[in-house]
Amino acid sequence: MGLFPSANDFKAGKGVEKDAPRKTGIGRFFELVGRDMNGMFLANLLTCIGFAPVICLVYIGFLQNSLPVMLGSAAVGGLLAGPALAEMYDTVLRALRDEAGYWWVTYRKAFKRNFKASLVPGVLYTVVVTLQIFLVYFCFNMLYHGTNVGVPLWVATVLNLVLFQMLFAYMWPQVVLLDQPLSLTLKNSINCMIAFLPHALAAAIVQVLFWGVVILCMPLGLFLMLIFGFWFVTEVSCQIVYGDIDRVFHIEENIRKLKDAELEAALKEDYADDDTPEE
């Protein structure tokens, strides 16, 4: 098996039950990479395109040394970044559900369906992340010039990073999977991050460490974003929390019921057409 295995590496063979449980951990990761890498990589490229405006706008505010300009730019750019990130999550969650279908067809349908619902979460996400980046930069910049901002601000900055990433780990899957108000999504996210604290913390640490490496490696970080960027960190994060979300909201059970109902309705329609006498 190579670094990026093909789906053939995971075909059921001798000794593998037809309805064997899904792989977990690193085995599940490589299974999805081998089977759904094309879709995740293309979704990653579109997500990078969706984030390009907000990155450029925030950087302009950074060059002006103006936090209000940075936050305002983040809010505007989040209107495009939000839908793009939502579809990155949708692509990964479909892979985790082992859902069949042509990627581009499902991507377009999901984009239209989730567009409005992802606008405000996108603004919230980009504004919060921009503020977090500013706080981290401020602390390290002061330290570089010989001034320690103090333990309370360092602790507040770290807690800010971790807590909000814990929140986002459960927020984005709900945005694309459930039709509900954002206030309820945020309430559910807080409840989930408390109820499943180890998973929420693990997902947050993955996000913080990965994007920290990307930022520290700039301008090489731009290359990392294009190749690994959103798909890698989204897949790992979703793999950690998806079991919790499915357990609480019964995602796969409800999807099966919906598809069964659609199939039953289609069959009834076909039978009705067959019973119609020809003139």
Model-assigned labels for residue ranges:
Residues 152-164:
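Alpha-helical transmembrane segments of multi-pass membrane proteins
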